[in-house]
């Protein structure tokens, strides 16, 4: 398409919105993530001589267009919702304002990055919520769909609330805690289980989590772990973090039995960690069964988002700038499916909170130049079923614009926070959700509505089309 615009001398400034239509996992919310990597992509976006030589070899591109690519740099504006923010369907996560050749080029990369990390961050937030304050460790690198999915998926999982990751490279690159234990192969490589435990404890007395299910969890694994813990205590070694890990079997039953054995031996502060194909539903079930587990290693189902392996982000044209007046002319994509009809214009997103408790009442999509007085009544409209409207009385709500400038005239103006700072922000964001919106079964939906003015423009565009 870029060459098509180039050869037709058509390169107007346009507005594109990146958004999604449905939350994953039947959730009521999603978590925005991936902005840092999107920024890095835009900053480094260029075509090398090697790139151009390859494109030339395809025999699809003319020389004048290839020459243009050699000097290509992104020159537009980008606005986005910061990472860690709770977000909802149909509202723009990223808005690109740029010449159409530039705006069109960045589509695939932006969606790839934001879709993936938003998916994993959302899944992680659900798993963390299910654990009810217990620590969740991200253990999925070996099951991720490739190295990058493991690396950046672990980053997203940290944003969603995990206390650490087994991916050492993620720890190095993003300064997040690295956590892990030994494998069954460690046990099997020694003459016996006790020796394996003893050698591991000698190496890592302050991170001594022993995997007890290689042979017989209750018959040998837990007893041998207790033996090693006693020897550590007798030697005057006080561990800051020690315990056992269960990776198979009936985790509820085994954890309760193991807890009693540890407590009877005087190790009431020993941790019981569990892994084994965990997700938010199994963790919830185990906690409801009274499982004596306080630390969870979650791998495959988290890093692959197994029950919803794709985040349905899309990228749609919303406005074209009039070259004479400089005004943005709203554009709309129609569909027989009402949910796929886009919202036109150069827009932003406002979050409306209940003034009394700080919980989210609704999100409001509005034109970028709109402003709202919290002390005045506000009428908002459903973007799909536009005959549905809600009146918010002045003084009962507060307003916060949640989109921020990231690039202006091709220059990055946004300072990316550290991942652990994003995680802390995400935790605060999740606390603005109503309890009813966080349950896993039939959660209460948070409404995303249109401003009065945007509603009128959308209605006019729809009416104009139907009059043709």
Go through each PLM region and give its residues.
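Hydrophobic residues within beta-strands of alpha/beta enzymes
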Residues: 179, 244, 272, 294-296
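An N-terminal, globular interaction/scaffold subdomain
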Residues: 40-44, 80-83, 87
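Buried, small/hydrophobic-residue-enriched core segments of structured protein domains
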Residues: 1-13, 22-24, 60, 66-75, ...
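Short acidic, Pro/Gly- and aromatic-enriched capping/linker segments at domain boundaries
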Residues: 78-84, 397-402
